Regions:
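Cytosolic regulatory regions built on CNB/CRP/Popeye-like sensor folds
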Residues: 1-146
């Protein structure tokens, strides 16, 4: 599983010791196509890494059917907002194809903060960069719709 973390941008530069610490309580699961991994509105404190397959991120809107916000594949991740805020899920994650995911509970990230604060800071900076990239992409999509 450590090889998987090495491919995920938010874990870049953390080093082997920090990655091993994050993986201490990681869980791996196969998810059949069509199964929901995390549902919008649910309280769940896991970050998910996609080892194989394809995951659709869906958002419910009052006036329409769920909209696919993104389709993610191997090396991608979702659910990272639970590390930053203790709020219900903002979207639904559903397997678009048979997939294998690894879940990391938020407690793993808190343990990293306690034991390796420098690496935790690197992780948060990487997350901020990724969220900034996603926000720029949304800005571009919004501008294109105007």
């Amino acid at each position: 599983m450590q090889n998987l973390l090495c491919r995920v941008p938010i874990f870049a530069g953390l080093g082997d010791k920090a990655l091993k610490l994050l993986l201490e309580n990681a869980e791996s699961a196969f998810v059949p196509a069509g199964d929901v991994i995390a549902r919008e509105g649910d309280v769940n404190d896991c970050v998910y890494l996609i080892e194989s397959g394809e995951i659709s991120i869906l958002k419910n809107f009052i006036s329409s059917n769920p909209v696919v916000l993104a389709t993610l594949g191997p090396g991608d991740f979702f659910g990272e907002m639970c590390i930053l805020e203790a709020l219900p899920r903002s979207a639904t994650a559903r397997a678009a194809a048979e997939s294998k995911v690894v879940s990391l509970a938020s407690s793993s990230f808190y343990r990293l903060f306690e034991k390796m604060p420098k690496q935790h800071s690197i992780l948060l900076l990487n997350m901020a960069r990724d969220l900034s990239r996603r926000l720029r992409r949304l800005d571009e999509l919004y501008a294109a719709c105007q």
